[in-house]
Amino acid sequence: MTAISLGMPAVPTKLADRRVSRQIQVGTVAVGGDAPVSVQSMTTTRTSDIGATLQQIAELTASGCQIVRVACPTQDDADALATIARKSQIPVIADIHFQPKYVFAAIDAGCAAVRVNPGNIKQFDDKVKEIAKAASETRTPIRIGVNAGSLDARLLKKYGKATPEALVESALWEASLFEEHGFGDIKISVKHNDPVVMVNAYRQLAAQSDYPLHLGVTEAGPAFQGTIKSAVAFGALLSEGIGDTIRVSLSAPPAEEVKVGLQILEALNLKQRRLEIVSCPSCGRAQVDVYKLADQVSAGLEGMEVPLRVAVMGCVVNGPGEAREADLGVASGNGKGQIFVKGEVIKTVPESKIVETLIEEALKIAEQMEKDGIASGEPQVSIGA
């Protein structure tokens, strides 16, 4: 009998190879080349309030942020940059709009990099030679940050709106001005609030240059909406090997941006997975309150710093299989739970003891992992089927 081909494409077993880009150094963090994708965020404080800004940077650092950006709209903010850059635990990027003088102030202050927006800095093109000279002397990278909302009027007239082509043309034009003056420590972003436009812009940019790319969906929205937009856009690009740093823009506390960014990287296996709680979404087969159980286990293991997969399952259909695949798991039913460790049932406990037992066993496994030198990391919790 002749075999019938269903015409199904082969399922890739890994992401596309990383795009080859030049590497720059943002303070202590390598960006581009073969460096890992890093997570950025931005402070929401007045930069001139040095204490509040440093406090927020400390909180971001604790959440796993690797690079932080601070706004610099006033002279008071510019005056604060030196102290903030010196005392910050992670590299500080100064975010400059409208006034070229603040670019020089940020470089003089010792910021790890400077973001410039070519769409709104007055006489920016005329200042590129001076900026390139100052940045070269201090080895300060420049991020050319193009945003759909502040695109140059010339390009809006040419394209009619902020198309992917308009964003890319703006970025590469400005990069070429720096290159004319011998400066190549450049990172580029081409942000749009529409993930489809944003993805297409980055694909075009990746095909036309070797600059490291900072990914972002601008004005992504409230936490839930912004998370979805960013996950869709970043997932598409990172799976194609495009992207060297990411920032999840949310109308939420900055630490939430970092949490989402880290989880996106972990979901794509671009970062060591941390604590991962896999729990079923619940259905009519569930014989326990899965939501409550998962929340209690998550709360009990908060802060655990080893890559541990814990399965919390509510019935006998998928429960045993998922529990066996995890480092630790429970398959619940009939008022009790079977506790699995590394695929083996070690005990059966009453429903009232499930959470307590899982936490005890998780701590035992974590202790052994730490003794064995297993890499640590920030917690991650994901709820899935």
From Swiss-Prot:
Its EC number is 1.17.7.3. The keyword Membrane does not apply. Keywords: 4Fe-4S, Iron, Iron-sulfur, Isoprene biosynthesis, Metal-binding, Oxidoreductase. InterPro entries: Dihydropteroate_synth-like_sf (IPR011005), IspG_bac (IPR016425), IspG_bac-typ (IPR004588), NO2/SO3_Rdtase_4Fe4S_sf (IPR045854). It catalyses: (2E)-4-hydroxy-3-methylbut-2-enyl diphosphate + oxidized [flavodoxin] + H2O + 2 H(+) = 2-C-methyl-D-erythritol 2,4-cyclic diphosphate + reduced [flavodoxin]. Pfam families: GcpE. GO terms for molecular function: 4 iron, 4 sulfur cluster binding; 4-hydroxy-3-methylbut-2-en-1-yl diphosphate synthase activity (ferredoxin); 4-hydroxy-3-methylbut-2-enyl-diphosphate synthase activity (flavodoxin); iron ion binding. Binds 1 [4Fe-4S] cluster. [4Fe-4S] cluster binds at residues 280, 283, 315, 322. It is an enzyme of class 1 (oxidoreductase). Pathway: Isoprenoid biosynthesis; isopentenyl diphosphate biosynthesis via DXP pathway; isopentenyl diphosphate from 1-deoxy-D-xylulose 5-phosphate: step 5/6. One of its GO terms (biological process) is terpenoid biosynthetic process. Its cofactor is [4Fe-4S] cluster. The keyword Iron-sulfur applies. SUPFAM superfamilies: Dihydropteroate synthetase-like, Nitrite and sulphite reductase 4Fe-4S domain-like. Converts 2C-methyl-D-erythritol 2,4-cyclodiphosphate (ME-2,4cPP) into 1-hydroxy-2-methyl-2-(E)-butenyl 4-diphosphate. Belongs to the IspG family. This is 4-hydroxy-3-methylbut-2-en-1-yl diphosphate synthase (flavodoxin). It comes from Streptomyces griseus subsp. griseus (strain JCM 4626 / CBS 651.72 / NBRC 13350 / KCC S-0626 / ISP 5235). The gene is ispG.
